[in-house]
């Protein structure tokens, strides 16, 4: 996580705009305090996000995520009906400065993570043990491998390995102590499901759940093919994997086509290269009583894959009016009208009478002045490792 030197003089405090929480204030830096005691409250890391316990009027204490409190108080939401998710612009979930937050839709939030490579896949070895003796039976490279060999669902194995359940499939399970292995997966090949934004699918038929942090295991339903159960809040739906793949990666050449056929006859081979749209008599896509006959095709998403451009990871100043990019000298001050970038890398703002340091690749040393009585230093090392402003979210493949 990047450390920022933030001046107290540029810290702005406002009351939290939630009914019943009037005695609390939050700052644009992500601090929370009690108005009556003027005491800044301690925060805890819960699931990768900083949160704080607040005691509203006549109600038990509630846990609130800091980034949502800051966004509700300082970040304008132009489309509150659709944009209900708070996104960290630089990818660092612990950086809760107001200028690093934005309101987005669930789809935009996932797409941001994919485009900026903030989803890192790893696989974690798991050990199958005798339920009575605890003796090791076999070690698998991943929960997926264990599930494929034993027939026990990945979810049940994970719950047992995490201690939620004592057993899964009649066996005890635990994770191996050896380091997790990183999987080289190109996330740019995945597309987000329109009606279920917490799921991604690629042209090989792999479906990844962002909520469960694992690949989903399809169920083989005989002649129907492989299907998968998706959920979003109270909404649940079972879909055929091959039709999902065709919907998102295979364009129809004829509007009369209403069926997806497996070229090799193997209904478990859902790679887009093995699928084709065709016409099947007797099927009426306007009759929704059978989800197996439902037409998932959406021409907006069924397009050839294009090379995604990675977004430039910059930190925008919420109070700035003008942005400039120059090659050598940079002016930058907290609350000023000018925000600047040095050589496409982001310069970190410093407050009045505050010294801040950042690391960047360059061949020389540059001293820059920012604001009134403020000095900023840039330490440079050619060919050395530089500090990153973004932090990867680590997901485990099971």
UniProtKB/Swiss-Prot annotation:
SUPFAM superfamilies: DNA-binding domain of intron-encoded endonucleases, His-Me finger endonucleases
Signal peptide: none
GO molecular function, one term: endonuclease activity
Record's compositionally biased regions (Low complexity): 314-333, 343-398
Cystine residue pairs: none
Region (Disordered): 313-398
Keyword Amino-acid biosynthesis: no
EC number: 3.1.-.-
Keyword entries, A-Z: Endonuclease, Hydrolase, Nuclease
InterPro entries reported in the protein's UniProt record: His-Me_finger_sf (IPR044925), HNH_nuc (IPR003615), Intron_nuc_1_rpt (IPR003647), NUMOD4 (IPR010902), WH-like_DNA-bd_sf (IPR036388)
Enzyme class: hydrolase
Protein name: Uncharacterized HNH endonuclease L247
Organism: Acanthamoeba polyphaga mimivirus
């Amino acid at each position: 996580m990047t450390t920022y030197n933030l001046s107290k003089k540029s810290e702005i405090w406002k009351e939290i705009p939630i009914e019943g929480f009037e005695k609390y204030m939050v700052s644009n830096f992500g601090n929370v305090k009690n108005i009556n005691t003027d005491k800044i409250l301690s925060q805890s890391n819960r699931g990768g996000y900083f949160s704080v316990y607040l005691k509203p009027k006549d109600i038990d204490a509630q846990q609130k995520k800091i980034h949502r409190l800051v966004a509700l108080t300082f970040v304008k939401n132009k489309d509150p009906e659709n944009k209900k998710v708070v996104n960290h612009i630089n990818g660092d979930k612990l950086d809760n400065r107001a200028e690093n937050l934005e309101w987005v839709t669930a789809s935009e939030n996932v797409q941001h993570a994919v485009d900026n490579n903030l989803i890192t896949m790893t696989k974690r070895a798991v050990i199958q043990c005798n339920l009575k003796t605890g003796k090791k039976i076999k070690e698998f490279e991943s929960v997926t491998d264990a599930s494929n060999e034993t027939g026990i669902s990945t979810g049940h194995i994970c719950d047992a390995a995490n201690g939620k359940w004592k057993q899964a499939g009649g066996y005890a399970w635990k994770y191996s102590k050896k380091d997790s292995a990183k999987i080289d997966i190109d996330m740019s090949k995945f597309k987000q499901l329109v009606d279920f934004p917490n799921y991604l699918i690629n042209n090989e038929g792999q479906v990844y759940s962002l909520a469960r942090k694992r690949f989903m295991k399809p169920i083989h339903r005989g002649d129907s093919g492989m299907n998968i159960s998706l959920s979003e809040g109270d909404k649940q739906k079972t879909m055929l994997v091959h039709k999902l793949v065709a919907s998102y990666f295979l364009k129809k050449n004829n509007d009369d086509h209403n069926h997806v056929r497996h070229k090799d006859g193997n209904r478990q081979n859902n790679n887009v290269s093995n699928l084709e749209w065709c016409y099947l008599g007797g099927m009426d896509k306007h009759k929704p009583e059978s989800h197996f006959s439902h037409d998932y095709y959406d021409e907006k998403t069924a397009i050839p894959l294009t090379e995604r451009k990675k977004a430039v990871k910059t930190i925008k100043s919420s109070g700035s009016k003008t942005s400039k990019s120059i090659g050598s000298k940079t002016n930058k001050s907290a609350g000023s009208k000018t925000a600047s970038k040095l050589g496409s890398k982001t310069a970190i703002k410093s407050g009045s009478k505050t010294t801040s340091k950042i690391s960047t690749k360059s061949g020389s040393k540059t001293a820059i002045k920012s604001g009134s009585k403020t000095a900023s230093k840039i330490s440079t090392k050619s060919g050395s490792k530089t500090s990153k402003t973004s932090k990867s979210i680590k997901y485990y493949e099971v």
